[in-house]
Amino acid sequence: MEETKTINIPVMADIFPKGEKPEFLFWVGCAGAFDDRYKKVARAFTKILHHLNVSYAVLGKEETCTGDPARRAGNEMLYQMQALMNIETFTRYEIKKILTICPHCYNIFKNDYPDLGGKYEVIHYTQFLQKLINENKLKIDSSILKDNHITFHDPCYLGRCNNEYDAPREVLNRVSTKITEMKR
């Protein structure tokens, strides 16, 4: 993962004033920014975006909390303040499409932000990868993990809340033939 540090990750505040408008905002999220294991997911996804020359940027220091934890904890006022600040930032940068690696971020952008005027095409990274694979834009060497056993559990906010069960499984089935569903 060390080689990811050499990738020049575009930041909206740097490129937008130059007239550059990327197709996607990659929302890194709290887990992708702070959790050591999830940082690896963010780095790997960034490498894929870079490798495929996807037009994207991050908010960098302008990325704040989505407000999801506040809303789930019952603090509606704090949620709305955080969401409206993000919507204002997205509007300033003319954001239309958001890529996210976090199921919680995916859920709140897709289902809650529209009530506050934040209407975006929100794409979970497994959906994005599935599309790239199906379009033959992303080639996967399935021989690398073909003998590895993968156990999968649906993230609640991706599966149960958004009924997205297929994308993660299709991606996993491309990399391994030994997939086990966790018991519910």
Locate the predicted segments by residue.
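Short hydrophobic/aromatic-enriched beta-strand-loop microsegments
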Residues: 118-125, 180
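Short, structured patches in soluble enzyme cores that scaffold and shape functional sites
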Residues: 28, 124-126, 154
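Short, catalytically relevant binding-site loops at active-site mouths
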Residues: 105-107, 128-131, 157-160
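Redox cofactor-anchoring modules in respiratory/redox and cofactor-processing assemblies
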Residues: 134-184
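Iron-sulfur-cluster electron-transfer modules
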Residues: 1-101, 106-113, 117, 132-135
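Short, structured coil segments at secondary-structure junctions
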Residues: 115-120, 175
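Short, acidic/turn-prone active-site loops that include or flank metal/cofactor-
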Residues: 124-130, 184
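Conserved active-site and cofactor/substrate-binding residues in soluble primary-metabolism enzymes
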Residues: 40, 81, 127, 163, ...
